[in-house]
Amino acid sequence: MARLAAFDMDGTLLMPDHHLGEKTLSTLARLRERDITLTFATGRHALEMQHILGALSLDAYLITGNGTRVHSLEGELLHRDDLPADVAELVLYQQWDTRASMHIFNDDGWFTGKEIPALLQAFVYSGFRYQIIDVKKMPLGSVTKICFCGDHDDLTRLQIQLYEALGERAHLCFSATDCLEVLPVGCNKGAALTVLTQHLGLSLRDCMAFGDAMNDREMLGCVGSGFIMGNAMPQLRAELPHLPVIGHCRNQAVSHYLTHWLDYPHLPYSPE
């Protein structure tokens, strides 16, 4: 029996309308009744996730910013990882050949240079939103991550530019087809989950995890039981071909799988 369950949010636990379904909430409560530790592992900000947990009265550990922060049930900071100031400076000040919008994160929130109302649709559940700033005046010593949002083909070309400029000084990953992230070296959900399990005295073999994008790759690959969403990025399936694929997030597939796991643990599972 797994002792910890780690969940990506967007494309995994959240439905396409960016809400948690009632079946999902019920299943999370059942896991807690079985003393299974809940962990939300997401690219979203800690401030937003703490608000969501409070609104839903959920007890869960948080891995946020794609591994840049880990918080306890009580909100205590257990782990932090920031971009080096010189890396943040290069990414913020360089003129990149891209149409993508740039977004900067630190402990105070989410910052960008202009209004992009369409991006806020993903945050209707929490009401979290960006702050408009002059990105050139952003303090460089406290940046957790920098994201670029736009067309996937454009972001793929940008990824090449970033690799050429940064080399091994940052970790680049797609958290969605339309979002490319610049993270500290060695920073990912899997590394953060390793820190958390050590804090809890658990083994990664004691964990299960669910995800749909390339920022979930390390986490899904390091746990005892990793599960890929039916709506996952093709690149993730190709990277982890040995992992089982469950259903689509629109059908609350995580809840569907876990209900079977809780009620019929010895029977084979079908996502249909």
Swiss-Prot record:
Pfam families: Hydrolase_3. Mg(2+) binds at residues 8, 10, 212. SUPFAM superfamilies: HAD-like. It comes from the Bacteria. It is an enzyme of class 3 (hydrolase). Catalyzes the hydrolysis of 4-amino-2-methyl-5-hydroxymethylpyrimidine pyrophosphate (HMP-PP) to 4-amino-2-methyl-5-hydroxymethylpyrimidine phosphate (HMP-P). This is HMP-PP phosphatase. It comes from Escherichia coli O8 (strain IAI1).
